[in-house]
Amino acid sequence: MAKERDQNTKDKNLLICFLWNFSAELKLALMALLVLCTLATLLPFLPSSFSISASELRFCISRIAVNSTSVNFTTVVEKPVLDNAVKLTEKPVLDNGVTKQPLTEEKVLNNGVIKRTFTGYGWAAYNFVLMNAYRGGVNTFAVIGLSSKPLHVYSHPTYRCEWIPLNQSDNRILTDGTKILTDWGYGRVYTTVVVNCTFPSNTVINPKNTGGTLLLHATTGDTDRNITDSIPVLTETPNTVDFALYESNLRRREKYDYLYCGSSLYGNLSPQRIREWIAYHVRFFGERSHFVLHDAGGITEEVFEVLKPWIELGRVTVHDIREQERFDGYYHNQFMVVNDCLHRYRFMAKWMFFFDVDEFIYVPAKSSISSVMVSLEEYSQFTIEQMPMSSQLCYDGDGPARTYRKWGFEKLAYRDVKKVPRRDRKYAVQPRNVFATGVHMSQHLQGKTYHRAEGKIRYFHYHGSISQRREPCRHLYNGTRIVHENNPYVLDTTMRDIGLAVKTFEIRTIGDRLLRTRQ
């Protein structure tokens, strides 16, 4: 019993010593518990307008976090990381994504003038938006992308190109980049920029085929600060460059005789009109042709089903470019898209054609596309004259029932003959001679351009017909010359006469899987 009593006494003394040593902490904990209980008691009696939202709470916490971590920076670097640890861009950025700026205060000068200061935050538009870059020769590259339109109109941004070999023992090479603005003044928030990186003529870039990275140093032209973005635009891995491709004396035949570069396809497109267009042109250009289409939201599931048979045959390639909608450029950035197509397929085709999916290329009956192109071989570019067709006036020579069952280019047979100063043209180029291109022609090429090919080749334009998801015939006529809404038209059955041959070609090539295609 005495032993048990002594043990209890020792335990009580130990507890008292523990409480005495931590009395301050216990007081703080008890005070906090008392405050929480008080708040819990008073909250039901507070007015309903008093509230703290979750967003406000997050804001307060984030402000505390930013203030308490004044040196918490992160380096933002995307795109390929170089194997030889070359530093690309190292910009101190706060956790909330805002670049830290040195704070400046206004001053009163000795003469009494108040000197004001201006500090910029964030970006209204990106300095450069990269789409892709391509090798154009043994010492030249092309970089295609977007940049701020006001920046190029009102400032003087510059570009420098740097080749960084994968082998650290090789020297880096720098050269000035030449910018080409291709949009003819049509840009919006963004404009298309093609940067030509041509190194000295006696220099071969990556001569041992050991690999390397091309950097584009893009400046904003700021007169006060040297703001430069270093962007890795192209990485060549070892033994991937085919230098024979760029030797003129070893030039081999291209994979395609004719390659179609399409502009951005957007909107609610008619599957039937796309079906007619692709079947017509696959037949027209022949076996050694290819079609590159760019989906900016216009290739829906129904349209893709029309293209699918031709994709499976290797005649069509579709590029999904919907992400470019983030950057507000002219007509869904079509200038950037066609320039990317030009340089991507530059060494794969002898001729490239640029026109729209509501336009049909035509050569006279006694000619062929191959004979016409041979006659124009001395030119780097030729333009194609437009034949404007009505997209709502149909020829009713076979009666309404048969007319409505015909394809669009068969029944839309009335040509607009109103005299106008000029009409838009489309064009074709030999891509090896072109540095940058546009929508209606290229202004940046070497060699001659031919503008009088209307006797050799033309195109029929059914403006707006591609975006009509209904029967195109709004009015039926039988006459050879008519006037509709004070506009003169003549009957032109050129395309109508080819319809049966195109339908037969489609059936023989891909079968009857598209017979139930809807408007």
Swiss-Prot record:
Record function comment: Involved in the biosynthesis of beta-1,4-galactan. Beta-1,4-galactans are abundant polysaccharides in plant cell walls and are found as side-chain of rhamnogalacturonan I, which is a major component of pectin.
Source organism (scientific name): Arabidopsis thaliana
A GO biological-process term: cell wall biogenesis
UniProt keyword annotation of Transferase present: yes
Transmembrane residue ranges: 28-48
Span of domain GT92: 257-471
EC number: 2.4.1.-
Pfam families referenced in this protein's UniProt entry, alphabetically: Glyco_transf_92
Main location per the UniProt record: Golgi
Alphabetized GO MF terms: glycosyltransferase activity
Domain of life of the source: Eukaryota
Tissues expressing this chain: Expressed in the midrib of mature leaves, root vasculature, flower filaments, siliques and seeds.
Official protein name in the record: Galactan beta-1,4-galactosyltransferase GALS2
Cellular component GO terms, alphabetical: cytoplasm; Golgi membrane; vacuole
Family: Belongs to the glycosyltransferase 92 family.
Database matches in InterPro entries: Glyco_transf_92
Topology in membrane: Single-pass membrane protein
Annotated keywords: Cell wall biogenesis/degradation, Glycosyltransferase, Golgi apparatus, Membrane, Transferase, Transmembrane, Transmembrane helix
